[in-house]
Amino acid sequence: MARIVTFGELMLRLQPYNYERFVQCDHVEFTFGGGEANVAVSLANYGMDAAFVTKLPAHAIGQAAVNSLRRYGVDTSLIVRGGDRVGIYFNEKGASQRGSVCIYDRAHSAIQEAKPSDFDWDKIFEGADWFHFTGITPALGPNVVEICREACKAAKAHGCKISCDLNYRGKLWTRAQAREAMTDLCQYVDVCISNEEDAKDVFGIEAEATDIYGGSLNHEGYKSVAKQLADKFGFEMVAITLRESHSAFDNGWSAMLYNVSKNEYCFSKKYNLHIIDRVGGGDSFGGGLIYSLLSGKDTQAAVEFAVAASALKHSIEGDYNMVTVPEVEKLAGGDGSGRIQR
C-alpha cells in the first residue's frame, strides 16, 4: 500500500447555517478543514496509507481537530503538539449571484509560529512514497517557507514523488511574495496542480482568450500554460482544473492533465454541477489525482477519476470528500444520473 504524507494547516471552520450571511446569523456550524488535510482524508477513504503533518495546540480544540481526521483513518501520529491557537476561517456560503466569502483568523496559529526544528522530516518520511503540500502553507510566513523547503529536501532524499497545488490566496500574501517562494519550492515538485487562474497569479502565465469572471475559458489555451509551467520547472505532470462559474450554485467543471514524457494533453469530460459546498473541491481533485497516479492509471483515466471525485465533493457539506473508489469510478464511467440506489 502506498504511503502519502501531506503537510499544512488544519483549521476550525465556522459557518452560518444554510445560506445566512454573517451579519444575520445567530449560530454557526463547527467543523475542520485545510487543503492538505482534505487531500489526506480523500486518500484514506480510497484505502491508502495517508498521514497528515502539522502543529496543533494540546488543548481540547486542537484535539477535536485531530479527531476529525482520525475518524476517516488518517494517520495523525506525526502531528506536533504545541502552541496556543488553532487557525480559524469563517465561511459564508454564497447563493445564486452572491459569491461565498471567506474570512481568515489564523494569525499566531500553532503552525504559523512553528519552527523548522519542530519537525523530524527524516522520521516523517520513513517508508513514504509521496509528499503533498499546497501554496497556502508557505503563505503563512517565512518560517513556514523554510519548513516546506526542508520537507521537500527530505522527501527527495527518501525517494518520494512530490506534488504541489499552487492554491494562490491573495489574503495571505502578495503575488510577488508568492512568486519568490513558489519559484524556490517548485524546483522540488514532480506534479504541479493549478486552477484556471493560479498560474497567472503566481507566475504570470495565463491562457489566451479566456474570461474567467465571465465564465468563459479557452481550454486549448491551457495547453500552453501547462507546457510553460513544465518547461520552467521540469515538472513530470501538470494538472489544471477548469471551473466555469455561472453562479454560486452552477458551475461547469473539468480538467486537463499534461503528461510531459508522453507529450499527452488529456482533457476530462465536463460536469455541469449544482453545488452544495465548493470548499475543498480542488483538494478532492488533488486527492483523486494522487490516488490515480499511485494506482498506475494512464493519463486519461487519471484525470477522469480526479475530476469525477471532485464533482462528487461539490455535493457534500464540509471540507472533506467522503466518497469511495467505487462511487468515483461509477461516475467517471458515465453514471451521473443521481438515481436512488436500492
Predicted region positions:
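Positively charged, low-complexity intrinsically disordered leader regions
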Residues: 1-21
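Short catalytic helix/loop segments, enriched in acidic residues and glycine
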Residues: 21-39
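Alpha-helix C-terminal capping segments
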Residues: 31, 39-49, 292-295
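Histidine-anchored nucleotide/phosphate-binding helix
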Residues: 35-45, 148-154
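Conserved N-terminal subdomain of the carbohydrate kinase-like
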Residues: 49-136, 328-342
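A short helix->loop->beta-strand "cap" motif at the edges of active sites that frequently abuts
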Residues: 154-161, 233-236
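Conserved phosphate/ATP/ADP-binding segment of small-molecule kinases
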Residues: 172-261
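Conserved post-catalytic alpha-helical subdomain immediately downstream of the catalytic base
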Residues: 265-335
